[in-house]
């Protein structure tokens, strides 16, 4: 019986040793051949995919209402801050009225210069300056056009009437001259016979002298008429010249006013465009959809300067990126395209899943941390689109901590354990 018990004990011992041997051998084989993920752990933080947008006001002014707060989500184009618009609106209204008057005045002067008697609304003015009194202003310009053209016409008509009067005088003078020349011929005929009679004694000497005196008077009147002809013709020429000069003066005057008005209208349009730009910016709107961050204005009625930074808008993004600092001695093992696993340590570890992604960028040169003065390479990784669904319901904000594990390959447990020893031994054997 004692032999039987001893034999059983030896059998159990051998079985135990076999189990230990097989277990150790299996563990050794697993450690030698089973693949384990090889990688690099990098602490990182969530960053904005794309840059945050600065919100500024180009002109500055007085804040009327602040419509948002830090952390508030806004849509693109949504009002953020409302500026006091009173001065800008008054400036627009004033310039609008002046511009409308300048354009209507320009149209009236152009009609005067062209000699047109009708005046139409300038093209595009109703859209550029939609004023309720635009029609009344156009009618006033029509009345001014008519009155100025009438005044000029009356002035020229008076000059033409003077010319007609001079021409009538000229015609009367021609008739008088004709009569005088007829009288001259008759007197010459009478004198030729009277001189013969007087020489023969048939006619008194004093009667001959009377006829000669009459002829001399007729000749004097003819000479006077000839001089009068020249004066009247000169007066007609001067009157015609005055008409031409007045018309030329009028055109020059209108042309000068027209050029001045055109310049004034262009200047006013530029000023109006600038004033409208200022009025449009009385409401500062979100450039993109996202979250308000870094709000720097807190008081209604406060004054902000031109170009002053008011807040940032952190854009919404369909992608999620993280950025970390990669140790300098590990940069040779990391490159773009490597798969990563990310763990958002700001959330409950038991409920937050690991999400997959890939390395999108490793900086080309090393950088220096301003706080600890340690060199590093910037590493960026992006969450896969398929993995974004795992983060639904979680509010991911820029700056949150993330643990990133970059998978660089596979190796065995024995390689993990003995490679540092082999590397050290290789260095030690190489030393002199």
UniProtKB/Swiss-Prot annotation:
Membrane topology: Single-pass membrane protein
Keyword vocabulary terms for this entry: Cell inner membrane, Cell membrane, Membrane, Transmembrane, Transmembrane helix, Transport
Native species: Pseudomonas aeruginosa (strain ATCC 15692 / DSM 22644 / CIP 104116 / JCM 14847 / LMG 12228 / 1C / PRS 101 / PAO1)
InterPro entries in UniProt: MFP (IPR050739), Secretion_HlyD_CS (IPR006144), T1SS_HlyD (IPR010129)
Cellular localisation: Cell inner membrane
Gene Ontology terms: biological process: protein secretion; secretion; transmembrane transport
PROSITE patterns attached to this UniProt entry: HLYD_FAMILY
Role: Involved in the secretion of alkaline protease.
Gene name per UniProt: aprE
Protein's recorded name: Alkaline protease secretion protein AprE
